[in-house]
């Protein structure tokens, strides 16, 4: 940063309704004060309002900011905006959610969790609590798994990480497993070895119609 110049950054969050994003903005406040810059936090009413967020991103880019912070509700919906950032020389930092196949040179930094590993760790910690139930069940066992959405890369990775690790653990104990429910997660699952009707364990995956 150069002295005597004003720097303002648009920061695109996924929603203003969740306390998660309120906490994130407190971190933005702290960093902005330390660096002597300002930022404008913007975001849709809910994480399901994908088109609204895309419009906000495009409006922010049109103002030629010095940089853009982005947590995309739907990673596939922002590819065009990212290409515009490349064309205009606007650096983008993604946070919370990385963006697969982002245009080359658009994203200069990602700040996010290893979401696949986070989902895997959740399965590893859950399995001991249900292992005996699965081993001793007289019939089919259903494991419910609910994901916030099927559009955000971070949520996709967490859900898939959980499902695939759970499949691995179930099969290691000699049981068969099937995955049913949301199409994205069913297709992303690896290692399921049975049809639903024949499986010892069924992982039932759901995604709500609306996300706040």
Q: PLM features: what roles do these ranges have?
A:
Residues 1-212:
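A residue-level marker of the well-folded mature domains of exported/periplasmic proteins
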């Amino acid at each position: 940063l150069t002295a005597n110049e004003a720097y303002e950054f648009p920061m695109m969050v996924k929603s203003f309704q969740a306390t998660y994003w309120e906490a994130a903005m407190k971190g933005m406040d702290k960093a902005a004060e330390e660096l002597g810059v300002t930022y404008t936090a913007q975001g849709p009413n809910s994480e399901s309002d994908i088109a609204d967020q895309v419009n906000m991103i495009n409006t922010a880019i049109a103002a030629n900011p010095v940089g853009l912070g982005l947590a995309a509700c739907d990673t596939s919906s922002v590819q065009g905006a990212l290409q515009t950032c490349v064309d205009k020389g606007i650096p983008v930092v993604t946070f919370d959610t990385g963006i697969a196949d982002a245009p080359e040179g658009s994203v200069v930094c990602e700040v996010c969790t290893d979401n696949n590993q986070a989902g895997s760790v959740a399965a590893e910690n859950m399995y001991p609590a249900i292992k005996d139930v699965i081993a001793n069940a007289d019939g089919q066992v259903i494991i419910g798994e609910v994901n916030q959405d099927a559009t955000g890369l971070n949520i996709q990775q967490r859900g898939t990480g959980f499902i695939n690790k759970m499949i691995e653990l179930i099969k290691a104990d000699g049981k068969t497993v099937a995955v049913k429910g949301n199409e994205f997660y069913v297709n992303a699952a690896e290692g399921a070895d049975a049809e639903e009707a024949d499986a010892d364990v069924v992982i039932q995956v759901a995604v709500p119609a609306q996300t706040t």
